[in-house]
Structures are given as C-alpha cells and as structure tokens.
C-alpha cells in the first residue's frame, strides 16, 4: 500500500536548520523522508544526513533514497546520543530535526491499528519489532491498570467505566480489531453524539502506552 505524505512546515524547517552545504544533519523522525529529501538537495558532496526511525516501514521506505550522503538507522529518537556516538558524529552535528508523534502513513494504514475509524488489528506499535501491542494491553491488563492508562495518558473522564466494561466484555470474547474496540467504547461512554469520536482519548492512551511515548 502506497501513501503520499506532505512534510509539516517544510520551508520553516529548512530555514530553521540554516543548512550548510557541507554540514552534518540528523532527521531523527524520518517518516517517509519528505524533510530528508529536501535537506539532501541543499547538501554538497561533503554533506551528510542521517535518518532515524523506529518504524520498520519507514526504514524500508528510506531504501528508495540511493544517495551515498544518506544513512538510515532503525532507532527511536530517544537513542539519539547513542546512535550519534556509534556513527562517530557526536558533537559534530550541525542540526537535528524531530517531528514528534504518530505519522500520517501510520494512521492511514488500517493494518497498523492506530485508527478508530478504519478496521484493523489492535496493534498500534510504531516499532513492529517490539512485542507489546494494544491487543495485549486491552485483553490482559487489570482493570486498575487500564483505568490508569485511560485517565493519565488519555485524560478520559470515563476511564474507570470504560476499563470495567472492557474487563467484563473480554471474559466473553477478547477484543481483536480497532473498530470492535472503538464501537464498544462509544457504546460504553454513551451520551449525545459529539464531533470527536468517543474513543479518541482511549485510543490515544493505548498508543502512548504501547510505544512508551512518555519515556522518549
């Protein structure tokens, strides 16, 4: 499945980096390479660009950039210091770019399990090599832990109610898909229709928990 993605604030990013043609730069959240490709256009043969991403799909997409000045590394941006040390560029980098958060291709691909509006597996892993999925959390975590995740990570006012209902329902049948869970949460919360889907906060909370985003 192919996705098109327009890089955020592209001109502002390039201006902020104040790119030197022979400089060393790091795109710590490579994504689909929109920013990286533009940075490369401003580098001469002595310039270097290193891309980082925890998403294996992003690392695979980076292979399309056949440029000796560019290197892709499968890593979260939280490991930036270690990566720079291993690459021998610690203290030599002229600029670093971070576009933090879930990316459009991740949300748009139902198979990644981030969307509460498109059916897919309860996954939500930004790094597919990690073992913890949303399905594991939803079907195995205690009522107290689920309530904590929904309340603290999602600021969900009905955290305890949703957690209690999930634990009760999964005893009958484990949750398997995103739409199954989102529609269930919608029914549990109830009330009048709202512009924002009622599962939004719980899905955000699960994504943060799966990817340990607050530890990044």
Task: Please identify what each model-predicted range represents.
Residues 1-216:
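S-adenosyl-L-methionine-dependent methyltransferase catalytic core, i.e., the SAM/SAH-binding region
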